[in-house]
Amino acid sequence: MKSRISNPEIDKLILLISKLPGFGPKSASRAALHLIKNKEQLMVPLAESLLSSIENIVTCEICGNIDVNSPCMICTNEGRSKYQICVVENIADLWALEKSEVFNGLYHVLGGNLSAINSIGPDDLNLKKLIDRIEGEKIDEVILALSATVDGQTTAHYVADTLSKHSVEVSRLGHGVPVGGELDYMDEGTIAAALSARQKI
């Protein structure tokens, strides 16, 4: 039965918030009420920021990162090593590695992992651009910084096998990443240790 305090506008706001990661119906309701209660201090600036993001944030044509420019600030930074590419599942993992401040090369965002359950195959990932970069740029090493989940490791093996046809060293994160672990949930120290202890494949 529909609640007597139900309102279409509020219901829509709660529904949209509930679609964000980490939000369920109750937490979405609390967030919606907090926004409404603090309309001028929070809701209006948030709406303006969202509109600005829609207009200005783009996906980097080279690595798949997001920025206000394409190519992004990482790809165009002359101070970074152009000989290493760190392959990550998603942008959150890229950010986690950047926070660790131990990697000074380039990145490549796959946009997911291979997954039979979710019907995600090689053609669904950003693999062709990775191969194009290796063939077109002077890349010495590709570091596979993928999650230690079943799908993550399956993807790592597939990418390593694909890259074995090219003259590039392929390595993966070493100790420090627990089985089933995902990068964006790990602290900077753990990520730094895993990157420093990377192993050749």
What are these regions (language model features)?
Residues 11-15, 29-33, 44, 48, ...:
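Solvent-exposed alpha-helical segments within well-ordered globular domains of core cellular machineries
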Residues 16, 20, 38, 53, ...:
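Conserved, well-folded catalytic cores of nucleic-acid-processing
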Residues 3-10, 19, 31-94:
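Cys/His-rich Zn2+-binding cysteine-cluster or related metal-binding knuckle/ribbon modules and their
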Residues 33, 72, 82-85, 91-94, ...:
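Generic secondary-structure boundary/loop-capping signal
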Residues 39, 131-201:
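Long C-terminal interaction/binding lobes of large macromolecular proteins
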Residues 28, 77-143:
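Extended interfacial segments that mediate partner engagement and assembly in macromolecular machines
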Residues 5, 38, 42, 118-122, ...:
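Catalytic cores of large soluble enzymes that bind and process phosphate-bearing ligands
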